[in-house]
Curated annotation (Swiss-Prot):
<dbReference type="InterPro" id="IPR013342">
    <property type="entry name" value="Mandelate_racemase_C"/>
</dbReference>
<dbReference type="GO" id="GO:0005739">
    <property type="term" value="C:mitochondrion"/>
</dbReference>
<dbReference type="InterPro" id="IPR036849">
    <property type="entry name" value="Enolase-like_C_sf"/>
</dbReference>
<feature type="binding site">
    <location>
        <position position="252"/>
    </location>
    <ligand>
        <name>substrate</name>
    </ligand>
</feature>
<comment type="function">
    <text>Plays a role in the catabolism of L-fucose, a sugar that is part of the carbohydrates that are attached to cellular glycoproteins. Catalyzes the dehydration of L-fuconate to 2-keto-3-deoxy-L-fuconate by the abstraction of the 2-proton to generate an enediolate intermediate that is stabilized by the magnesium ion. May down-regulate thymidylate synthase activity, possibly already at the RNA level, by promoting the degradation of TYMS mRNA via an antisense RNA-based mechanism.</text>
</comment>
<keyword id="KW-0496">Mitochondrion</keyword>
<keyword id="KW-0456">Lyase</keyword>
<protein>
    <recommendedName>
        <fullName>Mitochondrial enolase superfamily member 1</fullName>
        <ecNumber>4.2.1.68</ecNumber>
    </recommendedName>
</protein>
<dbReference type="InterPro" id="IPR034610">
    <property type="entry name" value="L-fuconate_dehydratase"/>
</dbReference>
<dbReference type="InterPro" id="IPR029065">
    <property type="entry name" value="Enolase_C-like"/>
</dbReference>
<keyword id="KW-0460">Magnesium</keyword>
<dbReference type="GO" id="GO:0016836">
    <property type="term" value="F:hydro-lyase activity"/>
</dbReference>
<dbReference type="Pfam" id="PF13378">
    <property type="entry name" value="MR_MLE_C"/>
</dbReference>
<feature type="binding site">
    <location>
        <position position="276"/>
    </location>
    <ligand>
        <name>substrate</name>
    </ligand>
</feature>
<feature type="binding site">
    <location>
        <begin position="24"/>
        <end position="26"/>
    </location>
    <ligand>
        <name>substrate</name>
    </ligand>
</feature>
<dbReference type="GO" id="GO:0016052">
    <property type="term" value="P:carbohydrate catabolic process"/>
</dbReference>
<dbReference type="GO" id="GO:0050023">
    <property type="term" value="F:L-fuconate dehydratase activity"/>
</dbReference>
């Protein structure tokens, strides 16, 4: 029995000054401060367990998401956890379909980021109650229960509830072997940490060299600011990693459609597997055009980290606008909405390669991609999960990478709990770190 009624919801603006060292920098986001709207929910249960959740931001604007979380809290406080998880679809719709709040969405923007933070905390608490890591909670669920967590509204022309159920039932075959394979070998990862756009050549060379020694074979390179510089950097990195290792490119929405096609063709000689976010994340038809034009040079299109909701993913898939689908554990409406996208990707036979470039994203998305392999896709072909080597030390249960692979978490929960001292030090603007930076005028407020 899942005990406890939610009695309070705490929300904190937590920011890390990553812009000072250009960590996370790309063609569009030149000075990001990796940040989170961090949620903690408490119940009246005797076990004292708490649910921890977050959504990822880049600094300024986190306060907007914090306000949105507070606006959603009235749908959460006073609810029994058992009632939520036994009617999860209804609870999800309560959060996303508030008759007034949905006007500033619906299911997109700051209000959807806030929804993810709240629901991530609920899922974390549920998994802790069941004494399982989140991925194992999902793997052990009956297909009917999994389907009951999903809101199929607006996507039944691409995936019906019956089709989703059949996919999950078929996924039971070989499930135990796949789970054992993950426990032994882990889920393949690629690194983005070597080639942020703001890094010097010396940094690139050292980081690539270190990564190769650690066993990394898949590398992502940020591009899009200057073509000549991109050519130089791609040549440097291709020379460093050799002809047999995999390179991907990421433009972070920098180009118009025709510009993207021309620019990427000029980089084709470096044999990138994909170009990520070549244009506006909302331009589905633009992505489709780019996909068609780059197909002859064997470069796929990857996108999804700023895809607002399952409806957009539906359209990307229907339009054949992406070859690699990148879910995000905090952009979509938490586990619930990600489940629907994983199932659509399976139906359309498109590999899922999650986005994880942000604080806490590696910790969260590892659970989703493990579930995808074990219960949905059943395949590792053309599949990998992003890894960035930043800020894991601030989490109670940090991600574990071994031989360039995500090793399945064993601790109960969604791996979302941050260390209390980190929250105190980095809360904005009153944490000790930020007070010092503001006093020294190293940052603008």
């Amino acid at each position: 029995m899942i005990t406890g009624k939610i009695t309070c919801l705490h929300i904190t603006d937590v920011r890390f000054p990553t812009s000072l060292d250009q960590h996370g920098s790309d063609a569009m986001h030149t000075d990001p401060d990796y940040s989170a709207a961090y949620v903690v929910i408490e119940t009246d249960a005797a076990d004292g367990l708490k649910g921890h959740g977050l959504t990822f931001t880049l600094g300024k604007g986190t306060e907007v998401v914090v306000c949105a979380v507070r606006a959603l809290s009235r749908h959460v406080i006073g609810k029994a956890l058992e009632d939520i998880v036994n009617n999860f679809r209804d609870f999800y719709r309560q959060l996303t379909s508030d008759g007034q709040l949905r006007w500033i969405g619906p299911e997109k923007g700051a209000v959807q980021l806030a929804t993810a933070a709240v629901l991530n905390a609920v899922w974390d608490l549920w998994a802790k109650k069941e004494k399982k890591p989140l991925w194992k909670l999902l793997v052990d669920m009956d297909p009917h229960q999994l389907v009951s967590c999903i809101d199929f509204r607006y996507i039944t022309d691409a995936l019906t509830e019956e089709e989703a159920l059949k996919i999950l039932q078929n996924g039971k075959q070989g499930q135990r072997d796949r789970e054992e394979h993950m426990l032994t070998s882990g889920y393949p990862a690629y690194t983005t940490s070597c080639a942020w756009l703001g890094y010097s050549d010396e940094q690139l060379k050292k980081l690539c060299s270190d990564a190769l020694k650690e066993g990394w074979t898949r590398f992502k390179v940020k591009v899009g600011a200057d073509l000549k510089d991109d050519i130089r950097r791609c040549e440097l990195i291709r020379d460093m990693i050799g002809p047999d290792n995999i390179m991907m490119l990421d433009a972070n929405q920098r180009w118009d459609v025709q510009e993207a096609i021309s620019w990427v063709k000029d980089l084709a000689k470096y044999k990138p597997l994909w170009i990520e976010e070549p244009t506006s994340p909302d331009d589905i038809l633009g992505h489709a055009t780019i996909s068609k034009e780059l197909s002859p040079v064997n470069i796929g299109v990857a996108t999804g980290e700023q895809c607002h909701n399952r409806v957009m993913f539906k359209q990307f898939l229907q339009a054949k606008a992406l070859q690699y689908l990148q879910i995000d554990s905090c952009r979509l409406g938490s586990v619930n909405e990600n489940l629907s996208v994983l199932l659509m990707a399976k139906k359309f036979n498109v590999p899922v390669c999650p986005h994880a470039g942000g604080v806490g994203l590696c910790e969260l998305v590892q659970h989703l991609i493990l579930f995808d392999y074990i219960c949905v896709s059943g395949s590792l072909d053309n599949r990998m999960c992003e890894y960035v080597d930043h800020l894991h030390e601030h989490f109670t249960y940090p991600v574990i990478i071994n031989r360039a692979a995500y090793m399945p978490p064993k601790d109960p929960g969604y791996s979302t709990e941050m260390k209390e001292e980190s929250v105190l030090q980095y809360q904005f603007p009153d944490g000790a770190v930020w007070k010092k930076l503001i006093l020294e005028k190293k940052v603008e407020v």
